[in-house]
């Protein structure tokens, strides 16, 4: 009974490895099975042999009173390898949707379809006993961000200077609600990848989730390979209901982790597409705004974006979302206008700069962070003010080209500030 097999280990294997394992355990017609069914059969065989089987996932509580553990690999959507959680366990540990749970599972009996959870070993990467006494997310006190997320990476081989420019122009803190305002083809996805890379390198204590809504499948693969964090996606060929379900699960998971005083960062691409998805899903209220947006449609994406906050009691939820503009669609403009004043940090990208192939194509004069004095120390703050005074008379393109040329001459922002003889 001491042998243990984990569901997560099986999910990490390639289909070819799983097939070899299935054949080793003499599972019938394994080659014709899909990956989920194959894992199901392998686990069932192991459970019958007396192995202890471990499973994990993110809880979704259904209206009927029971729940299922959904897996991040399936983007938290229902699948054959979900794990059933009984109402007794939900009550015992007072579990809610979004809780990340690890435990011991048993194989389904004759007329059952799912594995079921028998023992909980961890809740939100914490001891189950500690999880009982946590404060609900809505009752925590929100504050302005006061702890800096450093974007600059000490890597001399990096040619891309967008992380350093963000540190200078629009510093990001833990609990920031940031908006990247971007026309099409201005390099917003690459900018998000750079931010993700910086956070993974400089702040390993942060739990990083990249949420891609309505994006191209090849971009999803690119993100998964380049980002050291959790990448959750719903591509453009999926229905809007699926976009919504994925986004709701991600934000619930993040809230539960913040209740455990964790620092969570969500990078969302893009909030405009999420707004469109909610607009499709929400039942019509009869009041329609310009561009075909229903009056009630943006309530839920606002609640998603508004969840970002720095918590006084410990923990923070940072959301950095991209908003699309100049797409030629009135709906996108309306959605952007609704979100315009809600963030406390804005990075604005400019099409004219991108057309000159200058990257990052940032409009420095329009980008900035509110209450940046809480994030940046006094001497650096004075120097950024001086820098802005120098850049202000220049045009958008000249300003960014001037800044990039100056940054090329120095290895770090600290060195750059030293070279400014003020």
Swiss-Prot record:
One record GO biological process: DNA-templated transcription termination
Recorded superkingdom: Bacteria
Binding site for ATP: 173-178, 185-190, 216
The keyword Signal appears for this protein: no
The keyword Transcription is assigned to this record: yes
PROSITE patterns found in the cross-reference section: RHO_RNA_BD
InterPro entries the record matches: AAA+_ATPase (IPR003593), ATPase_F1/V1/A1_a/bsu_nucl-bd (IPR000194), CSD (IPR011129), NA-bd_OB-fold (IPR012340), P-loop_NTPase (IPR027417), Rho-like_N (IPR011112), Rho_factor_ATP-bd (IPR041703), Rho_N_sf (IPR036269)
One Gene Ontology cellular component: cytosol
Gene Ontology MF term list: ATP binding; ATP hydrolysis activity; ATP-dependent activity, acting on RNA; helicase activity; RNA binding
Listed EC numbers: 3.6.4.-
Boundaries of every Rho RNA-BD domain copy: 52-127
Keywords: ATP-binding, Helicase, Hydrolase, Nucleotide-binding, RNA-binding, Transcription, Transcription regulation, Transcription termination
Pfam families: ATP-synt_ab, Rho_N, Rho_RNA_bind
Biological function: Facilitates transcription termination by a mechanism that involves Rho binding to the nascent RNA, activation of Rho's RNA-dependent ATPase activity, and release of the mRNA from the DNA template.
Description of how the protein assembles with itself and partners: Homohexamer. The homohexamer assembles into an open ring structure.
Family stated for the protein in its record: Belongs to the Rho family.
Protein name in the entry: Transcription termination factor Rho
Annotated source species: Cereibacter sphaeroides (strain ATCC 17023 / DSM 158 / JCM 6121 / CCUG 31486 / LMG 2827 / NBRC 12203 / NCIMB 8253 / ATH 2.4.1.)
Gene it is expressed from: rho
């Amino acid at each position: 009974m001491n042998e243990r097999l984990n569901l997560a280990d099986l999910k990490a294997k390639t289909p070819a490895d799983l097939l070899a394992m299935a054949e080793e355990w003499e599972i019938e017609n394994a080659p014709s099975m899909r990956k989920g069914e194959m894992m199901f059969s392998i686990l069932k065989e192991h459970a019958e042999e007396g192995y202890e089987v471990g499973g994990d996932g993110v809880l979704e509580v259904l209206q009927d009173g029971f729940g299922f553990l959904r897996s991040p690999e399936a983007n938290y959507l229902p699948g054959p390898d979900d794990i059933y959680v009984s109402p007794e366990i939900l009550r015992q540990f007072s579990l809610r949707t979004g809780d990340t749970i690890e435990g011991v599972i048993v194989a389904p009996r004759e007329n059952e379809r799912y594995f079921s959870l028998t023992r909980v070993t961890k809740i939100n990467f914490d001891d189950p006993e500690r999880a009982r006494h946590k404060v609900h997310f809505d009752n925590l006190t929100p504050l302005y961000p006061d702890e800096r997320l450093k974007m600059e990476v000490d890597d001399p081989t990096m040619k891309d200077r967008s992380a350093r420019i963000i540190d200078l122009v629009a510093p990001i803190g833990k609990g920031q609600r940031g908006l990247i305002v971007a026309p099409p083809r201005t390099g917003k996805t690459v900018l998000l990848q750079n931010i993700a890379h910086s956070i993974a390198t400089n702040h390993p204590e942060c739990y990083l989730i990249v949420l891609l809504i309505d994006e191209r499948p090849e971009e999803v693969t690119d993100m998964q390979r380049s980002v050291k964090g959790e990448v959750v996606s719903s591509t453009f060929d999926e229905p809007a209901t699926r976009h919504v379900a994925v986004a709701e699960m991600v934000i619930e998971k993040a809230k539960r982790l913040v209740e455990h005083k964790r620092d969570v960062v969500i990078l969302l691409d893009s909030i405009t597409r999420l707004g469109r998805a909610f607009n499709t899903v929400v039942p019509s209220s009869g009041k329609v705004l310009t561009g075909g947006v229903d009056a009630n449609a943006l309530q839920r994406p606002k609640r998603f974006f508004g969840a970002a906050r720095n918590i006084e009691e410990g923990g923070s939820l940072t959301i950095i979302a991209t908003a699309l503009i100049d797409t030629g669609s009135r709906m996108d403009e309306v959605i952007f206008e609704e979100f315009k004043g809600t963030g406390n940090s804005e990075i604005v990208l400019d099409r004219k700069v991108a057309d000159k192939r200058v990257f990052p194509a940032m409009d420095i004069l329009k980008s900035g962070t509110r209450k940046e004095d809480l994030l940046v120390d006094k001497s650096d703050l004075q120097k950024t003010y001086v820098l802005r005074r120098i850049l202000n008379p220049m045009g958008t393109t000249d300003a960014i080209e001037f800044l990039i040329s100056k940054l090329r001459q120095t290895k770090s922002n600290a060195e750059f500030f030293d070279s400014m003889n003020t």
